């Protein structure tokens, strides 16, 4: 069996389609377990630490669709992690302080690929 190497420019194609974000948000809102009306009427204020990754795109967009006031912390998706990106207690000092300072209802911290999260309660812990 021969191994064929390809130059990086010959590895395939990709496409940009901004509609997928909205499609994904709509799928989440359509889930029976999401109490959309209750959330929209609750006047929540939430701090989001997107660790400068994809979570900084999706989580604020989802919360805004739910009429949640979203305070963004590290939500520029540039890949420059402002702290260790593992959503563990010892990495939550920035968001903990901001949740308290902003009198937020809670905070959401995600890891870079948004498959794990940590929640910070209104007291910052």
List each language-model region with its residue ranges.
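Gly/Ser/Thr-enriched, mixed-charge loops and adjacent short helices
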Residues: 1-102
């Amino acid at each position: 069996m021969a191994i064929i190497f390809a130059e990086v420019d010959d590895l395939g194609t990709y496409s940009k389609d901004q509609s997928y974000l909205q499609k994904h948000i709509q799928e989440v809102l359509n889930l029976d377990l999401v109490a959309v009306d209750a959330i929209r009427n609750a006047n929540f204020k939430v701090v989001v630490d997107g660790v400068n990754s994809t979570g900084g795109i999706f989580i604020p967009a989802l919360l805004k669709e739910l009429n949640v006031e979203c305070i963004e912390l590290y939500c520029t998706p540039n890949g420059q992690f402002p702290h260790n990106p593992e959503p563990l207690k010892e990495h939550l000092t920035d968001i903990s302080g901001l949740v308290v300072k902003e009198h937020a209802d809670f905070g959401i911290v995600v890891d870079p690929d948004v498959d794990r999260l940590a929640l910070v309660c209104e007291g910052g812990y």
